[in-house]
Amino acid sequence: MSVVLGFDESPGARAALASALWLAKAAGERLVVVYGTAPPGSMGEEARTHEAVLRQVGGTAIQHALAEAEAAGVETVTELVSARPVDALLEQAEAHDASVIVVGTWGESPMRGAILGSTPHRLLHLSRWPVLCVPAPAPA
């Protein structure tokens, strides 16, 4: 089993990382750090540019999470996925036998999340795994 974390370096994602590390360590499970972003198109230069940006930006984000996981002594797998974050997380939850999916929130209103389809909101409705939504810290 594993703890699947959606990570993008936002304040909410950083808070979610701390919770996911705690859960993985307490349960003796592997942490799967997922960075997913949807491609703008499926052909040509636009798709190639997207893949390059995914590897660069997503790779940097994942490396930061991986460093924290290693410092905490948690076995970690990383996944860069060219798909909408919700789809990426559900796909990786299935692939890695998730016990829970952990995501951060960024303080949006529930109505805005429902209308715009935020990742946490959509996961709560689509996931067959438990979803832990961790709020971003309050601004100082």
Where are these regions (language model features)?
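Short glycine/serine/threonine/alanine-rich loop segments
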Residues: 29-30, 74, 98, 129
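Glycine-rich, Arg-bearing micro-motifs that act as flexible, cationic patches
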Residues: 100-125, 139-140
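Small/aliphatic-rich secondary-structure junction motif
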Residues: 1-47, 52, 77
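Structural beta-alpha unit
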Residues: 67-101, 138-140
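Short, flexible loop segments at boundaries between secondary-structure elements
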Residues: 130-140
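Short, hinge-like loop/turn segments at secondary-structure boundaries
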Residues: 49-52, 95-97, 119-120
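A short acidic, glycine-rich active-site loop
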Residues: 49-61
